[in-house]
From Swiss-Prot:
Transmembrane segments: none annotated. It comes from Rickettsia africae (strain ESF-5). It comes from the Bacteria. One of its GO terms (cellular component) is cytoplasm. Belongs to the UPF0235 family. This is UPF0235 protein RAF_ORF1191. Gene3D superfamilies: YggU-like. Pfam families: DUF167.
Amino acid sequence: MDKFYNYNSSSHQALLSFKVKPNSKQNLISNFVIINNIPYLKLSIKAIPEQGKANEEIINYLAKEWKLSRSNIEIIKGHTHSLKTILIKNINEDYLNLIINSYIK
């Protein structure tokens, strides 16, 4: 099984894979899900998936949850799909591992 993220140490950037469930009761990252043998972090978002509202809430939630600037978080794949690839810029690998380990149960 592959990892759900890739880290580039020269650019201090990470690509993370998420399975997003919009229109949820709360914003929450809850462990992993495997789809076609590919791992994804599960992300529930309160916003509805209309006119980019859920995508905007994803960025806001991750920025607040991980104490990052919104400008360092970008959805680069899956804008209209529940499977998303998100780019995190200017992140230290140790801090990324700390974040990741908090979701491994």
